[in-house]
């Protein structure tokens, strides 16, 4: 019984090793009372309190005394004590009377004194290592009445099944058993024979072991999602090759056959090999060196990829990336980061379902630019529940990109090429059709006062300016067809009051042309044409008979600019051209400006009112392509134009002599304001 008598008449003292004392201290740390532990191991409670005070010293002694011989000898002593009883009815020791047996099992000389080292647990410190497992003789003789049936299996395959905390119980939750140090204390549950799991150590040490295991075996890193697997996921396990663990005869009940019907547990998850597994839930890229072909998942497994986590077999080396992707996958957020667009698109994607995305949906699976991660969906399509959020992000990005003229040009080019079969008036907008014209117009825009007509547009697009109607078509339609707003074209658009209507039809974001063909937008476009017609008529001083040709439409101010004595033919230096006009004592410009300011006040107000009406209609509109960002931008734009339009009127009434120059300056500042708002 391993109990020696001291002097006659004193209580029997147990010769406990430091390992036994540390085990008792650990039971106290795990929540048992000192009294119950002292009663179990047969020492006074005061002695146990003294052990707790000297815990560090005992741990050091336990580390020093942990040798193979000690383990085998201590086990032999315990076995010899009950050997005469044979099979479980014998005297003391491990196979003592049934009512005492459970208490003595807790004193097995397993070492729990320090952090678990896998090699030591497998080979040195296991109490059953001294037995011969080559035959079943010892198993039959010992009977294992007090031990769970697969204790020997746990001892043999300990590297693959380190989480031994009663995880083979059918009703046990595997993830709870894996992390709870109290999950298998049978003085709380009384369900199994062993009084305490060999791994029921403190929570901090068990967490350390979990982290260490996750580093050693990356297949365990996805353990957090064990419960989301279906109960029949046991077929995901693949048996570990027999050469990798110490070859020992398993316990009488076969390890794999007994638990094949149970759910995926931490033990068999650890056994799963990345390369094997017919139905493992991953998009593995096989034969990378040979063919590099992508193995797309089978259709039966594809639906579960939205909710369940993936294995690590195909991941890139970055663990942080894997963690992010697995969190997204478990939360069902995978469509927030769609696969890259395979067409080589350099501009922000056009919102909603444009031909870009339609061509993307046609390819299954999509052409990836990187190895597929768990968050990429098999078909490249967007999940419906997140499509609105994704569209909002795209719209916001596109509206921000319109501030960059290069990105805007690319977006306009791309939208035009994608929709040439739909667009009927694309040929009229010369600045849309020809890339060289777009570049030229971007480089040669002028920022003249509103009375000056754009020379560059007249000179390079003579065929588009045959009549005022077609000229205005060319101005308004590209805006409606998805061309981002021309931020510096002051001469092309006659007055800032027209821009709300142009924007309300185009909404400052690359859009398909089909969207703009609603009755409201066509009405506002025709009204805009009429207003511009009236302005051109009054500026040129022509009669209203017949359409205005470009030669007649170019006003006398343009004639003064085309004069050979005028050195500023590039139309880019505003102050120089104004000074040149004044030096030549050409009074027609100032008179026309005064006329223009008088006659357009009512038309500006009317146009702004139309813009506000259209804004109200847009707010009540249920078209999903109209985003809140666009409405906010349009609201700010109209407000900026209103403020920039009222200040010239006030200054004009206050200073009638200098009305022309002040009005020009104020309108320029108003335009700068709206440009800043955008």
Curated annotation (Swiss-Prot):
Tell me which Gene Ontology terms the entry assigns under biological process: antennal development; central nervous system formation; compound eye development; regulation of DNA-templated transcription; segment specification
**Disordered, as annotated region:** 232-310, 344-381, 445-528, 541-592, 645-678
State the superkingdom.
Eukaryota
> Where is the sequence biased in composition, kind Low complexity?
372-381, 570-586
Modified positions (Phosphoserine) are 251, 254
Could you tell me the keywords of this UniProt record? Developmental protein, DNA-binding, Nucleus, Phosphoprotein, Transcription, Transcription regulation
Instruction: Quote the subcellular location field of this record.
Output: Nucleus
A GO cellular component annotated for this chain's UniProt record is:
nucleus
Bias class Polar residues marks the residues at 241-254, 349-363, 449-461, 495-508
An example Gene Ontology molecular-function term: DNA binding
Q: Which SUPFAM superfamilies match?
A: Homeodomain-like
DNA-binding interval(s): 34-54
Known tissue expression? Coexpressed with danr in the presumptive distal antenna, but not in the leg imaginal disk. Both proteins are also expressed in the brain and the eye region of the eye-antenna disk. First detected in early L3 eye disks in cells surrounding the newly initiated MF. Levels are uniform and high anterior to the furrow, lower levels within and posterior to the furrow. Limited expression is seen in small groups of cells in leg and wing. These appear in the location of prominent sense organ progenitors at relatively late stages of disk development.
Q: Does the keyword Transit peptide apply?
A: no
The record's section on Pfam families has: CENP-B_N
Q: Where is the composition biased (Acidic residues)?
A: 462-478, 657-667
Predominant location category: nucleus
Q: Which InterPro entries match?
A: Homeodomain-like_sf, HTH_Psq, RD_transcriptional_regulator, WH-like_DNA-bd_sf
Domain called HTH psq-type: residue spans:
7-58
Q: What happens when the gene is disrupted?
A: Flies exhibit partial transformation of antenna toward leg identity and small rough eyes. Ectopic expression causes partial transformation of distal leg structures toward antennal identity and antennal precursors into eye tissue.
Q: How does it assemble?
A: Homomers. Interacts with itself, danr, ey and dac to form a complex (or complexes) containing the RD factors.
Describe the task this protein carries out: Probable transcription factor with a role in the retinal determination (RD) network. Regulates ato expression and is required for normal R8 induction and differentiation. Danr appears to repress Dan expression, but Dan is required for Danr expression anterior to the morphogenetic furrow (MF). Dan and Danr lie downstream of so and require dac function for highest levels of expression.
Q: Can you name this protein? A: Protein distal antenna
